[in-house]
């Protein structure tokens, strides 16, 4: 792969890239060859992207060579904690307080064109997206059957903090957080122990 460049794009540029991002989404997911399924999958992604772009603080980083090879995007979690709606049990205090103060940034999607170096590109994308925000935590939700993504996030020091039940899409997601900064990491020593007991693998 040629040298990969990372670049931040604003919401208007992200909207203009919608078609390319949808192609990237379909290419980066193992989908049946049936055209109807691919079209529905593409449309579902575009609808989610449109919804995310409208959220306050939306941010996106793209990876390019001579063409688009990856992207990561998300938004700050609102202080009302709505993003955690459906969390199974009590939200850990170490997460609840930063959420209330606006210190959590949610990564809603990381897409990378399949390639032997795709894990490194994905890691760089998430690091760049989070480094641009003064957040205490990164947060994301993952389908529990998406074992490659769960394994990759865990190798990047994301912690599994529980389950979130949502009415749409997969019934249940694994909720993961990434402590950012030494003080945050130290504050989460107990959470790390909890993560090791909750992790399904």
Predicted regions and their residues:
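Short amphipathic alpha-helix that is part of the acyltransferase structural core
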Residues: 1-47, 55, 60-69, 73, ...
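Conserved acyl-donor/pantetheine-binding loop and adjacent beta-alpha core of acyl/acetyltransferases
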Residues: 73-111, 117
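Conserved catalytic-core motifs of GNAT/GCN5-like acyltransferases
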Residues: 141, 157-174
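Short hydrophobic/aromatic beta-strand element in the GNAT-like acyltransferase core
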Residues: 57-62, 71, 104, 109, ...
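Conserved active-site tyrosine of GNAT-family acetyltransferases
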Residues: 25, 152-154, 158
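Conserved acetyl-CoA-binding loop-helix of GNAT-fold acetyltransferases
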Residues: 107-131, 155
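Conserved GNAT acetyl-CoA-binding A-motif
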Residues: 131-144
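A short helix-loop-beta-strand connector motif used in the catalytic cores of GNAT acetyltransferases and
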Residues: 48-62, 77-84, 106
